[in-house]
């Protein structure tokens, strides 16, 4: 990623499945900005309470302080005029207004970094993330390792009571290792109730 100093704002998206390193990459970019003495604000969706409600935390234990919010409007309202970098964790949990909020912040000259799942457990586009990917200047899609076969994993497998989840299960279910596995396209399974009834 080649960034021109003094340029207007822009949007960066860090996406991929669970365990692909999205939070670690967001934390890395935030820390680099802080080392450069840039004013940074970090936000995360209030639904994400897996590790700590007031921190963005990676599965590996890295963490950085964040402001928990429940809507994209909260982010726009709380961003200070002198903030140079706005980082947003768990972008997929936000309402569709996040796309416009990020665009307005970038138009105001801010560097906006959004990390989140690009696909839900079904393997379908998740919330505002695909729209953010379309309007972002920079998109990095990270991959994990399939927990079944060891191939490159781009999907998130939801596991309920040791079995793959059903297609019509609720889209949002906050969890970590006990609920989700990284999977490749071949090993990713989504059950359909009509198949079980045959």
Swiss-Prot record:
Establish whether keyword Metal-binding is in the entry.
yes
Leader sequence range is: none
Swiss-Prot/TrEMBL GO biological process terms: DNA biosynthetic process; thymidine metabolic process
Q: Which InterPro entries match?
A: P-loop_NTPase (IPR027417), Thymidine_kinase (IPR001267), Thymidine_kinase_CS (IPR020633)
* Molecular function in Gene Ontology: ATP binding; thymidine kinase activity; zinc ion binding
Its catalytic activity?
A: thymidine + ATP = dTMP + ADP + H(+)
- In short, the EC number is 2.7.1.21
**Sequence positions that bind ATP:** 16-23, 89-92
List, alphabetically, the SUPFAM superfamilies matched. Glucocorticoid receptor-like (DNA-binding domain), P-loop containing nucleoside triphosphate hydrolases
Q: Keyword Transferase, does the record have it?
A: yes
Annotated residues for binding of Zn(2+): 146, 149, 184, 187
Q: Which PROSITE patterns match?
A: TK_CELLULAR_TYPE (PS00603)
A GO CC annotation given for this chain? cytosol
Name of the top EC class for this enzyme: transferase
An example of a Pfam family matching this protein is TK
Active site (UniProt): 90
**Compartments where located:** Cytoplasm
Keyword list, A-Z: ATP-binding, Cytoplasm, DNA synthesis, Kinase, Metal-binding, Nucleotide-binding, Transferase, Zinc
The UniProt subunit note reads as follows: Homotetramer.
Q: What PANTHER family has UniProt attached to this entry?
A: THYMIDINE KINASE (PTHR11441), THYMIDINE KINASE, CYTOSOLIC (PTHR11441:SF0)
Q: Which family does it belong to?
A: Belongs to the thymidine kinase family.
State the protein's name.
Answer: Thymidine kinase
Q: Which gene encodes it?
A: tdk
């Amino acid at each position: 990623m080649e960034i021109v100093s003094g340029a207007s704002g822009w949007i960066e998206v860090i996406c991929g499945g669970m365990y692909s390193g999205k939070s670690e990459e967001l934390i890395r970019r935030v820390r680099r900005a802080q080392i450069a003495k840039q004013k940074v604000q970090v936000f995360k969706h209030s639904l994400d309470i897996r590790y700590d409600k007031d921190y963005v935390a990676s599965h590996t234990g890295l963490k950085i302080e964040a402001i928990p919010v429940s809507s994209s409007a909260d982010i726009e309202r709380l961003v200070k005029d002198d903030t140079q970098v706005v980082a947003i964790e768990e972008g997929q949990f936000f309402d569709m207004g996040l796309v416009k909020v990020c665009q307005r912040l970038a138009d105001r000259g801010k560097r906006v970094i959004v990390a989140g799942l690009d696909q839900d457990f079904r393997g379908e586009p998740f919330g505002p993330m695909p729209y953010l990917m379309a309007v972002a200047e920079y998109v990095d899609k990270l991959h994990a390792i399939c927990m079944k076969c060891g191939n490159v994993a781009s999907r998130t497998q939801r596991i309920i009571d040791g079995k793959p989840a059903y297609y019509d299960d609720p889209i949002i279910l906050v969890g970590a290792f006990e609920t989700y596995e990284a999977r490749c396209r071949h090993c990713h399974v989504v059950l359909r109730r009509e198949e079980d009834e045959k």
